[in-house]
Amino acid sequence: MGAKTGLLVYADGDIPELLRRAGAADRDRTATMMRRLYPGRGIEECEGSVLSDGVYPPEGTVYAASWPGVEVVGDRGMMIDLPTQLPEHLVAASAGRRLVLHNMHSVVDWLAFAVWEDGRLVRSLSLSPDDGVMENIGEPFPFELPYWAGDRSADVIPWPDEDEEPYPLPFHPLELGEDALRALCGFVQEGRPEDDDVNADHIRLHGFRIRDPHGSGPAKKEAALQGTGEAVGPPRFYTFGPDGLLVENDGV
């Protein structure tokens, strides 16, 4: 699967320590949190996951858990290029506590993370080799400093028979992404686990399917695509005629 995250965490204190102490999350408590964070959406319970896998659920599914002091939400819908565009009601829900957003996608080497304290943004970073630095707000955290200082330059292996080109960024976003995930949430996706890391394989998340009453769920999207194909009709084939103009054929 690669390193992919769409993760939102609310906490009253140190997230890694709170997750280390987390037991089984109450389903009713978690469902109440879901209704608060997804107002006006249809919410149906489904099979859950563990934290290590639940940070990147299938489309239309959210994996979540709520404990006293800490709440976790895994949702692809949180994967936004600019963390400052996180919906206001999600930021408002962090009043009096810390909010961490962590997004990562290994296919495009993209990383975005942000931290709010009591609803106030203190740090936001989003970057990828294709788009460069899209957002960089606030003072870097200590775990970032070696990267910005040039001590963690990207080590990219070129394809065979291709010349090596300089990596567009001073470091690899996914390497910083793993360090950010560990520092902010206590675990990693693909890095080497450390002794005091949170065991994300042992933390269960409840599953929920999210439906927009005014939008399109997976079934509606499939039907819409089928309808588009029917509207387009069968393929039409053309060849060049003797006069050099396109002439429609019955097929090939």
Enumerate the predicted regions with their spans.
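Structured loops at beta-to-helix junctions and adjacent beta-edge loops in soluble globular domains
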Residues: 11-13, 75-76, 208
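Short loop/turn segments at secondary-structure transitions that flank enzyme active sites
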Residues: 14-16, 79, 130-131
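Long, compositionally biased intrinsically disordered terminal regions
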Residues: 103-104, 110, 118-252
